[in-house]
Structure formats: C-alpha cells, structure tokens
Amino acid sequence: MTKKRKRQDDFQKVKLKVGKKKPKLQNATPTNFKTKTIHLPEQLKEDGTLPTNNRKLNIEDLLSQMHHYNAGVKQSALLGLKDLLSQYPFIIDAHLSNILSEVTAVFTDKDANVRLAAVQLLQFLAPKIRAEQMSPFFPLVSAHLSSAMTHITEGIQEDSLKVLDILLEQYPALITGRSSILLKNFVELISHQQLSKGLINRDRSQSWILSVNPNRRLTSQQWRLKVLVRLSKFLQALADGSSRLRESEGLQEQKENPHATSNSIFINWKEHANDQQHIQVYENGGSQPNVSSQFRLRYLVGGLSGVDEGLSSTENLKGFIEIIIPLLIECWVEAVPPQLATPVGNGIEREPLQVMQQVLNIISLLWKLSKQQDETHKLESWLRKNYLIDFKHHFMSRFPYALKEITKHKRKEPNKSIKHCTVFSNNIDHLLLNLTLSDIMVSLANASTLQKDCSWIEMIRKFVTETLEDGSRLNSKQLNRLLGVSWRLMQIQPNREDTETLIKAVYTLYQQRGLILPVRTLLLKFFSKIYQTEELRSCRFRYRSKVLSRWLAGLPLQLAHLGSRNPELSTQLIDMIHTAAARANKELLKSLQATALRIYDPQEGAVVVLPADPQQRLVQLVYFLPSLPADLLSRLSRCCIMGRLSSSLAAMLIGILHMRSSFSGWKYSAKDWLMSDVDYFSFLFSTLTGFSKEELTRLQSLRGVPHVIQTQLSPVLLYLTDLDQFLHHWDVTEAVFHSLLVIPARSQNFDILQSAISKHLVGLTVIPDSTAGCVFGVICKLLDHTCIVSETLLPFLASCCYSLLYFLLTIEKGEAEHLRKRDKLWGVCVSILALLPRVLRLMLQSLRVNRVGPEELPVVGQLLRLLLQHAPLRTHMLTNAILVQQIIKNITTLKSGSVQEQWLTDLHYCFNVYITGHPQGPSALATVY
C-alpha cells in the first residue's frame, strides 16, 4: 500500500450501524468516579520558634499571604494578623516594619472587604504603637495614604478617609507634618483643575472648580461633606500643633537644665533659712548655660528634600487660602442656592446646614492659623481686602440661619395635601453655625472700619445679645464662640452703652442655675478678663461697669454656697476673689466681709472643706479683710485647733493676723486697726489652749475612762489626746509662741497670759495633756527676770506637772502612740521646774506618800530618782534636800515590812550620790521658802 493510501485511511469516517453502540476508544478517560474537597483548617507542622494563631499560622505565614492573588486569602490573612497580634502583642515591636509595609500596601486594594479588614487592623494597631515607634515608618504610611486619596476608584478614596481618621486621632503631629501633600489631596478630592489654555495666565484661585462624579454611590454634597469634615479635623490638629510649637519656642528644655524654668519660683522661707532650698534667681545663673537653639530634627522624608513647611509660612498659607476659599464659597452656594433662597428666618435642611458648618469651621481654622503668623497684621488686611465682600454677599445675606426639620403627618385626611412642617429649635447645628460665622466676620473688622461695617456688625451684636438673654442651655463649645464674639465686639466698638449691654447679657446667662462646669468656667474667665482689662487702664479713662461690680460682689456668697460640691469651680472663684481683693475692690471687700463668717466656719465653711491649695488662698484672703471682729477671730481659732487646716496653714494664718494687729510695727491710727488688742490676745490664748470653753466643760464630767489619768497625789486629772491632735496642737502653738515673743513689753504680755490661765484653766479638774504641755511651753518662752508669777498660778502648775510626769512614767511599752509624746512633755516639765523653783517645791510638798497606794509608790520613787539625776534640777534638789530626805524616809518606812525592791535601792543610791555626797552637805542647803 502506498503512503498516499495510508494517509487517506487515517481520515476515513467510520460508518456506524443503527442500534449499535459506538465502540470505546483506547485512550478514553473513565468519568464514573466521585470527588471530595479537602479542607485544611490548620497546619499540621508547627513552628516552635514563632507564636501562631488558632490556624497554626505564624506572623511570617500571614504576611506572605498578603501577596496572594485571591482577595479572600488576603482578607483572611488580615483577620489572622489581628487575632495573632491580640494574643501576642510583643510581636508588634519585633515585626513592626513588615506589618506596616504589608498593611498599608492594601490601602489601594481593589477589593472592598480587603480594605475594610486593613482599616480594622490599623485601628487595632494604632493605639498600641507609640508615635516614636511610628515616626521612622510614617513616610511609607503617608505615601500609601496619599496614593489612596488620589486613586481613581471611588471606593478607595472613601476608605482612605477612614485611614486618615485613625492617623489624625493617634498621630496628629506626624500626619500634620505631611501637610503640603495632604492638603493638595483634600483639594483634589472635591475639585479638579482647569487646564484650558485660556486659564494659564489667570490666578490659581480661578483654576480649581468643584467636581461632580455621577458614578459615586454618594451624592456630591454628601461626599464633599465627608471630605470637609476630615479637612476641618486636619486643620484643627495643625492649629493645635502650631500653637504648642510657638509656646515651646525659645524656652529651654526642662530635662537639659532643671534649674532654668519659666514658671514662678515658690520660696519656703523656713527651708531657705535652714539652707534646705536652693534659689536660682537668674535663668543662666547655674553652671549649665541656657542654649536656645532653633535646631529641629526633620522627618525622614528621604533624599535631600527639605523640611515640609506646610502652612507654617505666610506664603504657603496665603496660597492655600487662595485655592480653598473659592471652593468653600462654591460649596456654600451649592448648599444654599441664591435663586432658591427663602426669606430670612426660614430654616435650612440638616444636610446643607452641615456643609455650611464645615465650610465655616475650615475658614475659622484658617483665620486662627493666620493670626498665629500675622505679627504685623498685614495678613489680616489682606484677608479683609480679598474676601470681605464675598463673605457679606454670600454669608450675611440670610443671617441668622435656622434649622428646618421635616415632620411627616399621619395620613388621616387623604384629600388634603401633606405639607412640610417647619420647626425652629435651639439645635447645636444652626446655633454653632451662626456663632462661627459671627466669629469669622468680626475678626475682619476693627475700630478704623467701624463706620463701613456698622450694618452687619449691628446684626451680629443683636444676635449675640438675644442668644445670651434667651436663657437657652449652651454647651462649652457654643459659649466659647459666643464669648469670643462678644469680646471682639467690645474691642472694636468701645462704646460704654453697648459694652454694658453685652456684659449685662452675659451676666444674665451667668445667673442661670445648673450650669455645667466648663460653661461656668468660661463665664468666670470672661468676667475676669474684663475686670483685668479695666484695671490696666489709667484712672482717668477707667470705666467701672455696674454689672461687673455686681458680679464681683456676688462671688463671696457663691463661694459660701458652693463649698466642696465643686472644688474646681470653688478654686476658680477664690482666685478671682483674691485678684480683686488684692486690688482693694470696695464692692468685693464689702461682700467678703459680710460673708466671712460663713466662709471661715470651722464646721462647714469653704476654708475647711476644700483641698490644701484653695485653703491656702482663703487663708491669704484674711489679710485683705476690712475688719476682724471677735466672732470671726473665734472661728479662725477653731479652724486652727480642729485640725481641718494643716499646721503650716494655721501658722500662716497666725502670722497674717499678727501682721494686721497693732503689734506688727506698722504705723496705724487707732481707728484703722483691723482688730482690738483684747480680741487678738483672746485669739492667741484660744489657739494656745487647743480646746473651746464648751469642750473643756464637757471634759470635767469624765471619770473612770481609759483616756483620763488620775493620781492620788494631784487634784488635776489628765485627758490623753490622740497623737495626731497632740502633734497638730503642738505645731500650731509654736506659731503662737512666736507671735507672743515679738510683742513688746514682755512683763505685761506675761501678766495678760497668766491672768487668762488663772481665769479659764485654774480650777478645772480635767486638763488635756497637750494643753498642759503648751501652757508650760509658753510660760518658759515668755518668763524672764521682769516677770512675776501669780501666787494662784503656782499650785496649778505644780499639780499639772506631777500629773504629766506620772503619765510619762506609767506609759507602757505597747502604747506606741503615747510614747511619741514623751520627749516633748518631759522637756517642758523639766524646763518649768528649772525656771520656777517654787513649782518644784510645791510639787515635792504635795508628795504625801502616806496617802499613796502601793501601786503609785514606785512611781513616786522613780520620779524622785529622775529629778535627782537631771543636771538642770540638781541645784534646786539640793535646796530642797531636807524635803526630799523626808519623802524618802517616809517611803522607806512604808516599805520596811517587806523585802526592799530595786527601785527603792536605786533611789537611796541616787540620794547618797547627789545629796548626801555633795561637798556642802544637805544640812547646809536647807533653805526655807
């Protein structure tokens, strides 16, 4: 067969007979098998070096899946990363670079679910990564964000705004450092640039127009609202960062030189006198000079590119304003078309009103940035020249704006047409919008242009006054705008009648009850600012507002009512009262004098219920009181001794009262003295005793209680005070000692003191231990050779001295609270016995041991032994040697029937050493008093 014939046989068609099946081919594939899918929920092989999630995937596995072509795999990898990093947070620091590079790369992914997972992961990671850690990688993050914001896909642009929200919240300083690129991106999100040849030579403000994208799922107005909200947040972060930078400029870092600071120097004179406080007067007076440098570390933008100035330069700010303001005006016109404008007073729907609010917020922030850089007011003039006409035409034509709410009626009457019901409400939207607009407009006005702008300024003034007087509840943001506009109006139009009207309107709002703390604080600061401005003027041009005087006069009463219910607000009131009192404001001082009894009440007054800092300011206010009557001094004394004031504040109060007394050395006439000498001495003695007359009277009925020490040899019982009360009383008494010591005529001073002791303390049967100790202390301080001690006082001192010594000798080791009193009380007892030998003799004469029970006899013996051993008393003990010898003899007689104890042996030994063994002998020293 030829080759040609063979080729033909290959292509011959096989003829099949009817009813017979087609024969199977030799290479036919069987298709009768069944298949099942294989699902691997986790890896079989585990990696022990890296932590894994519930699917046994570690960080490297998950990051590698980010490059997969399938969107579901990438989404699963992002969710797995979130799960893994939530279980093992330490992985973030180790793999931060890889995590950020992979996560930010999917900002522009075409799948919406992948982008959503990336945004959720970034929101989870951002709070866990510090700004210092993020800073090296932020150029990469910013580049991907910029790429997403300028992407041609609408969904990617929308998701980029979510990423921007996260970065603005967590890293405002880093994101605003890239402002040059991001601000341009904001512009491109809502507009496009005209590239026609006719616009080449025109300015840049006319080359950008709003863009409309019909393919976007949102309306053009909704999309612009989203972008404008983010732009407002971005400019707010930029303004905050710029203000912080300006505050820190030129100041030395505290870490570099802790001695150099711009704050006030607080000097504690007590510590300074003891060389415990170092005071550096001059900033560069230390060993480390202040090096003020303008050097700043720039961001790692790569290459040799310069620092991103953004809007920090005036030229850049002007350029951005020229581009964005026309676009914002277009947004405004789109929200409120002039051809469809309803009459003034009719409402605007919520969505257009929100667009208008964001437009004004952005303009207000741009104005704020311009004020931070406009030192010569050139930029302010430029803004007025270029934009005042447009603002008046578009913004003020329908001022003020209101919100229209659409209410749907029920279809009960189908024949009647359903009409929209317009509802006016004091909603935050329209009120804040009107206030922001007022703030922008008044910033463009000044005193020189008042005649030209009087029409729209009067509109704003009327709106501000009505808003303040209508009694509506304002939040702090609204009130801050409102007070800012009011202040600016008073500056540009310093008319007394108009200013008084505005102040009266603010005072009407201030008188409302139930205002929240931020609102009340803003009102206080506003009035304080007005008052300080008035005080800075010369007396010739000073205008005292009647409303302001009424406000000042009401502050002390407000403080008395407020008390501790709001300590922060009370502190602000005290600061304002202190400022006005220091300037001798008559109305305030008169009101403060009338309210002083309530403020300085020892039970519920502000001086005892507030924290330490406002307490100190209230104590300082005592210096400015016009008069200090006896009832007020009595309350101040109770404040000192009750422990509600610290001992240092009590000492400060005592020092202030001394400075306002006739003994301070100031040359006053008798009618100008704030308090009489009798009242001043009464205050000092009441503070010295530490207890009121009523409290001492109640103590006299105490018997047989653990806090009362009773002896068989002394008629005076000792009341044991708590340790805290004892120490506080002791510290306060030190200040009383100092005030008494500086009073001239020491003998007269001592006579007044011992007369008070004889009148109020002598005759009492129960005396507090702190009172007895302080009385001994003040007598020892004041006693000199010119002083004569009263005969009625000596027995009382002797009885108190024995009671104190008995208490000290019977303190058990377990009573740690009373052990801390031992040194102080022992010192004053020994001092009083050394200075007044007659007190020692009277105490020895009272030791009639035949009346003493067996439990008190060892205490008497121990007391005699200690008195003999104490060097300052040795001479006086020699003088009373016969009396001491008789007491020891009586003790020995009482103990003759039993075995001699150790304390009696020690007593005999000390008597033989210090009395019998003395060269002169006891018989030669027998002196009869």
UniProtKB/Swiss-Prot annotation:
The modification Phosphothreonine is found at T29. InterPro entries: ARM-like, ARM-type_fold, HEAT_type_2, Ipi1_N. It comes from the Eukaryota. Disulfide bonds: none annotated. Keywords: Cytoplasm, Nucleus, Phosphoprotein. It is found in: Nucleus, Nucleolus; Nucleus, Nucleoplasm; Cytoplasm. PROSITE patterns: HEAT_REPEAT. HEAT repeats lie at residues 99-137. GO terms for cellular component: cytoplasm; MLL1 complex; nucleolus. Component of some MLL1/MLL complex, at least composed of the core components KMT2A/MLL1, ASH2L, HCFC1/HCF1, WDR5 and RBBP5, as well as the facultative components BACC1, CHD8, E2F6, HSP70, INO80C, KANSL1, LAS1L, MAX, MCRS1, MGA, KAT8/MOF, PELP1, PHF20, PRP31, RING2, RUVB1/TIP49A, RUVB2/TIP49B, SENP3, TAF1, TAF4, TAF6, TAF7, TAF9 and TEX10. Component of the 5FMC complex, at least composed of PELP1, LAS1L, TEX10, WDR18 and SENP3; the complex interacts with methylated CHTOP and ZNF148. Component of the PELP1 complex, composed of at least PELP1, TEX10 and WDR18. Functions as a component of the Five Friends of Methylated CHTOP (5FMC) complex; the 5FMC complex is recruited to ZNF148 by methylated CHTOP, leading to desumoylation of ZNF148 and subsequent transactivation of ZNF148 target genes. Component of the PELP1 complex involved in the nucleolar steps of 28S rRNA maturation and the subsequent nucleoplasmic transit of the pre-60S ribosomal subunit. Belongs to the IPI1/TEX10 family. This is Testis-expressed protein 10. It comes from Pongo abelii (Sumatran orangutan). The lineage of its organism: Eukaryota, Metazoa, Chordata, Craniata, Vertebrata.
